[in-house]
Regions:
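Active-site-adjacent elements of ketosynthase-type condensing enzymes
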Residues: 31-41
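A short, Trp-centered hydrophobic/proline-enriched beta-strand micro-motif
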Residues: 19-30
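Short beta-strand-to-turn element immediately C-terminal to the catalytic PLP-Schiff-base lysine
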Residues: 1-4, 43, 69-72, 86-89, ...
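Residue-level signal for inorganic ion chemistry
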Residues: 5, 25, 53, 85, ...
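A generic structural signal for beta-strand entry/edge sites
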Residues: 46-50, 66, 108
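A short core secondary-structure module
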Residues: 52-97
């Protein structure tokens, strides 16, 4: 949607919107989530580019129909030289492999490119616009992930409340114990903080994507996305971890669901950057070191 390539958007977006194909983003080749993680090379030749390298942590990368990929021209560093491409996942030279992860509910893959040749028409970004465009996409993705994490945190809290209400000890429900109430109150606060941050960030993203929206939304997007990802990541993990504890001895067993939420919370905390990473990004924005 952010690309200036109208032909590519007309071709792919209609199919995505109709549910005919699925698409995913591949850009990082390491455990980092900034521009330094882009190491796949895009060597230009007459009429196109030749790509070589490997992507890691590609969500649904083994099953998707369309890949949106980021690569950099040889010798470029930092934000310079980054290009974005759209290509069918079955393009010759692409190999995909699903990788085992902590979270069985989200499929990740590695995608390897070997002498993959793309035409100039498959380029999504103009020279110099690759990273700014990708950076905004990642911020919007963080907001979407934060909303998912908030829902996971709420569900973790709900299933915990249902369990402790029915669990009796010393002739009474353990939900009536003051210490348990305090812990549940802390979890509710974590969920509400994540929810508020996610709602606000979603409003900012809506303004940014609206052609008639507030022009200042782009400047607010970076701060809102980082704040939402921080609160949602920490809130979800806190709720999932406490859910295991408050379920007692059955909390870590496969017969109960808390372990699924715990794994999802930990994996989602790492995806698109940890809270520590986003705090660093937030500090850079506040001090004017990063747009």
């Amino acid at each position: 949607m952010l690309s200036d390539n109208s032909a590519l958007k007309a071709h792919w977006l209609t199919q995505i919107a109709a549910g005919e194909i699925t698409a995913t983003l591949a850009y990082t080749s390491s455990a980092r989530w900034d521009d330094s993680a882009i190491t796949v090379s895009a060597q230009s030749f007459a009429g196109g580019y030749r790509l070589n390298g490997e992507y890691l942590y590609v969500v649904d990368g083994a099953d998707c129909d369309l890949l949106i990929i980021a690569a950099r021209t040889p010798g470029s560093i930092g934000e310079a030289g980054i290009r974005l491409f759209a290509l069918p996942a079955d393009t010759p030279g692409i190999s995909r492999r699903q990788v085992p992860t902590l979270d069985q509910t989200r499929r990740l893959a590695s995608v390897t490119l070997k002498d993959v040749e793309l035409l100039d028409e498959q380029l999504l970004s103009e020279p110099g616009q690759g990273w700014p465009m990708l950076r905004d996409v990642l911020r919007i993705a963080c907001i979407g992930l934060a909303a998912e994490q908030t829902g996971g945190a709420q569900q973790s809290l709900d299933l915990t409340l249902a369990y402790i209400t029915g669990r009796e000890q010393f002739g009474r429900s353990i939900a009536s114990f003051q210490a348990i109430k305090h812990r549940c109150a802390d979890l509710m606060m974590a969920v509400e903080c994540a929810r508020s941050a996610s709602y606000y960030a979603a409003c900012i993203a809506t303004e940014y994507l609206n052609i008639d929206g507030d022009p200042s939304a782009r400047q607010q997007l970076a701060e809102a996305a980082a704040t939402a990802k921080i609160h949602a990541s920490e809130g979800f993990f806190q709720c999932a971890a406490e859910s295991i504890q408050l379920h007692g001895g059955v909390g870590f067993t496969w017969e109960y669901d808390p372990h699924l939420y715990f794994k999802r919370a930990r994996a989602s905390e790492q995806l698109l950057g940890t809270p520590a990473f986003h705090r660093e990004q937030l500090a850079k924005q506040i001090f004017g070191e990063q747009p």
